[in-house]
Amino acid sequence: MTRLTLALDVMGGDFGPSVTVPAALQALNSNSQLTLLLVGDPDTITPLLAKADFEQRSRLQIIPAQSVIASDARPSQAIRASRGSSMRVALELVKEGRAEACVSAGNTGALMGLAKLLLKPLEGIERPALMTVLPHQQKGKTVVLDLGANVDCDSTMLVQFAVMGSVMAEEVIGITNPRVALLNIGEEETKGLDSIRDASALLKTVPSINYIGYLEANELLTGKTDVLVCDGFTGNVTLKTMEGVVRMFLSLLKSQGESKKRSWWLLLLKRWLQKSLTRRFSHLNPDQYNGACLLGLRGTVIKSHGAANQRAFAVAIEQAVQAVQRQVPQRIAARLESVYPAGFELLEGGKNGHSRVHN
């Protein structure tokens, strides 16, 4: 394994350095080839490194930043006032070649805008998309995008997402000829927004994409598709709804409930069932798949959930390591070169092709 360097915006997220710095130390402990650039306020970061040993400190460097982009700031305003912010400095380290990827739990809109401004989209990509890998009930994984980078998407953008998602499924998960589906309100050809139906027609003409049609949200975790494509609004709502349900389910499994009046053997049986079910469904825990990759850029950017805990942010760092090692941007660029000659172009009026819904 070759050495690699990541830039961490340690000031971003709901909890800032109190979570991101311990997560950085955890990541260093798990990967001896990793070097981390901690971008933020040195006075806040330094005390949190007290438990780091000499070997870990040799693979750490604090990069000062003057400010933090607020999580509730409007993206346009945040970008204009971003100079010297921890997020922008971390991205600039990637642009300058000092780091191979950036990880941030900060403002999603600002991260998207700054990454596009500084790192530039790949040739043939209109706008980058946020992608994550979710577990399903067949104990496999599904690539899902967009998860919030683009609230409104035309048909061409959805096709581009399908191309990028296919590359991720092949290169990161190792799926040969991955199945691709569009998230829709029904499986019938006439259902959904014009943009979705137009994207469906386009995907049928691309030989390098194994397009299987529409998928409804209730089948997200069934394993019926390897890549699920949707606009950022739908994807974000779907993901957060799923995370909330899974967290509630796992919490119910762990709760003790009314146990005081039960006999000892019923208590033992209940605890055994709780442990068994928790083990059975623990792979659905959202913390285990934290970290959405911003696909379609000339560099690697990972967006962590803003409310991520230490374990979850460490997972996001590992996602960045995997993306760099798999050379995701380069592989997407190569696939785009092979796909575009297949004959899809920006549809006339595509930007306005998503205003009508067919039920």
UniProtKB/Swiss-Prot annotation:
- Provide the E.C. number(s) assigned to this enzyme: 2.3.1.274
Any one of the GO BP annotations: fatty acid biosynthetic process
Chief location: cytoplasm
The terms under GO molecular function for this entry are:
phosphate:acyl-[acyl carrier protein] acyltransferase activity
What SUPFAM superfamilies does this protein map onto?
A: Isocitrate/Isopropylmalate dehydrogenase-like (SSF53659)
Q: Describe the reaction catalysed, as an equation.
A: a fatty acyl-[ACP] + phosphate = an acyl phosphate + holo-[ACP]
User: Which Gene3D superfamilies does the record associate with it?
Assistant: Isopropylmalate Dehydrogenase
Q: Pathway it acts in?
A: Lipid metabolism; phospholipid metabolism
Instruction: Enumerate the subcellular locations listed in this protein's record, separating them with semicolons.
Output: Cytoplasm
Q: Which top EC class is given?
A: transferase
Top-level taxon of the source organism: Bacteria
Q: Which UniProt keywords apply?
A: Cytoplasm, Lipid biosynthesis, Lipid metabolism, Phospholipid biosynthesis, Phospholipid metabolism, Transferase
One Pfam entry name: FA_synthesis
A single GO cellular-component term from the record reads: cytoplasm
* Membership in a protein family: Belongs to the PlsX family.
Known role: Catalyzes the reversible formation of acyl-phosphate (acyl-PO(4)) from acyl-[acyl-carrier-protein] (acyl-ACP). This enzyme utilizes acyl-ACP as fatty acyl donor, but not acyl-CoA.
Its quaternary structure? Homodimer. Probably interacts with PlsY.
Q: What is this protein called?
A: Phosphate acyltransferase
> Where does this protein come from, organism-wise?
Citrobacter koseri (strain ATCC BAA-895 / CDC 4225-83 / SGSC4696)
